[in-house]
């Protein structure tokens, strides 16, 4: 993911948590916050230390980043998202991760997701 699509700072994460809306499925929780003034969407990832070791957590983050890269044309701009991975995604394949992300984005009311 390019820098313009990342949330890195703690206060930006906290703003999305406190002011945003959340949607979830068994694998992911997605918080979203509307920010009409920004031209792009931004994504922040969080994988708890309760989920496996560092290798497993980094693998999950890589798969989520790749799925977001493939779906970036279908994700609405002007929003901040924080994606929190849950334990079941530790055993998932890339295709399952992508399908699960599409499902949770659809539940959050994003009209541009078509798949």
From Swiss-Prot:
Gene Ontology BP annotations: tRNA 5'-leader removal
EC assignment: 3.1.26.5
Domain of life: Bacteria
Keyword RNA-binding applies: yes
Protein keywords: Endonuclease, Hydrolase, Nuclease, RNA-binding, tRNA processing
GO molecular function: 3'-tRNA processing endoribonuclease activity; ribonuclease P activity; tRNA binding
Gene Ontology, cellular component aspect: ribonuclease P complex
Pfam families tied to this protein: Ribonuclease_P (PF00825)
Gene3D superfamilies: 3.30.230.10
Listed InterPro entries: Ribosomal_Su5_D2-typ_SF, Ribsml_uS5_D2-typ_fold_subgr, RNase_P, RNase_P_CS
Enzyme class: hydrolase
Catalyses which reaction(s): Endonucleolytic cleavage of RNA, removing 5'-extranucleotides from tRNA precursor
Presence of the UniProt keyword Lipid biosynthesis in the record: no
Function statement: RNaseP catalyzes the removal of the 5'-leader sequence from pre-tRNA to produce the mature 5'-terminus. It can also cleave other RNA substrates such as 4.5S RNA. The protein component plays an auxiliary but essential role in vivo by binding to the 5'-leader sequence and broadening the substrate specificity of the ribozyme.
Subunit structure: Consists of a catalytic RNA component (M1 or rnpB) and a protein subunit.
Family stated for the protein in its record: Belongs to the RnpA family.
Protein name: Ribonuclease P protein component
Organism: Bacillus cereus (strain B4264)
The encoding gene: rnpA
